[in-house]
């Protein structure tokens, strides 16, 4: 799949860091683990060897996945974005029409989404409903749990922390 996908500069740094760690640390470590397990004799009944080979397969698969992702990434520097309309990278504060509670979300790429840090994927129902809206607009968000209505209170573009 050659489709580009948006990612923040910080998110891209995180992917690159994981890729370098897997290639230069984990790959060497697992090779040493496999060599050590081989020294224990019969490989057909060597659980240590099998576990190390499985871990190696996982690491190699993740390396390929990360290489593909970094090749397809379209890096967007949120610090250089501005405007009143909500788009990728926006930090959006909303008021829930039902509860009057204020909630803030940051719209990021799908590989950066982390609801515990209020980072929602650009492909999520809330982000899809918010894209193109601006302060004062009302949005209706349909989720698996039902429909929610929000008012957009602020739209900001600021650098993310890792």
UniProtKB/Swiss-Prot annotation:
Keyword Nucleotide-binding appears in the UniProt entry: no
Domain of life (superkingdom): Bacteria
GO molecular-function terms, A-Z: DNA binding; RNA polymerase binding
Record bears the keyword Thylakoid: no
InterPro entries for this protein: GreA/GreB_C_sf, TF_GreA/GreB_CS, Tscrpt_elong_fac_GreA, Tscrpt_elong_fac_GreA/B, Tscrpt_elong_fac_GreA/B_C, Tscrpt_elong_fac_GreA/B_fam, Tscrpt_elong_fac_GreA/B_N, Tscrpt_elong_fac_GreA/B_N_sf
GO BP of this protein: DNA-templated transcription elongation; regulation of DNA-templated transcription elongation
Coiled coil: 45-74
Keywords, alphabetical: Coiled coil, DNA-binding, Transcription, Transcription regulation
A Pfam family: GreA_GreB
Role summary: Necessary for efficient RNA polymerase transcription elongation past template-encoded arresting sites. The arresting sites in DNA have the property of trapping a certain fraction of elongating RNA polymerases that pass through, resulting in locked ternary complexes. Cleavage of the nascent transcript by cleavage factors such as GreA or GreB allows the resumption of elongation from the new 3'terminus. GreA releases sequences of 2 to 3 nucleotides.
Family per record: Belongs to the GreA/GreB family.
Entry protein name: Transcription elongation factor GreA
Species annotation: Rickettsia conorii (strain ATCC VR-613 / Malish 7)
């Amino acid at each position: 799949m050659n489709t580009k996908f948006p990612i923040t500069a910080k998110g891209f740094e995180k992917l690159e860091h994981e890729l370098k760690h897997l290639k230069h640390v984990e790959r060497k470590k697992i090779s040493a683990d496999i060599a050590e397990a081989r020294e224990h004799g019969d490989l057909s009944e060597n659980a240590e060897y099998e576990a190390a080979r499985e871990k190696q397969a996982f690491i190699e698969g993740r390396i390929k996945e990360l290489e593909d992702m970094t090749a397809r990434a379209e890096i967007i520097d949120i610090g250089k974005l501005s405007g009143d309309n909500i788009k990728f990278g926006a930090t959006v504060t909303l008021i829930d029409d039902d509860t009057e509670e204020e909630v803030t979300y940051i719209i990021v790429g799908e590989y950066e989404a982390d609801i515990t840090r209020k980072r929602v994927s650009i492909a999520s129902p809330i982000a899809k409903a918010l894209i193109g809206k601006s302060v004062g607009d009302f949005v209706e968000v349909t989720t698996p749990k039902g429909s929610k209505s929000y008012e957009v209170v602020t739209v900001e573009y600021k650098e993310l922390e890792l």
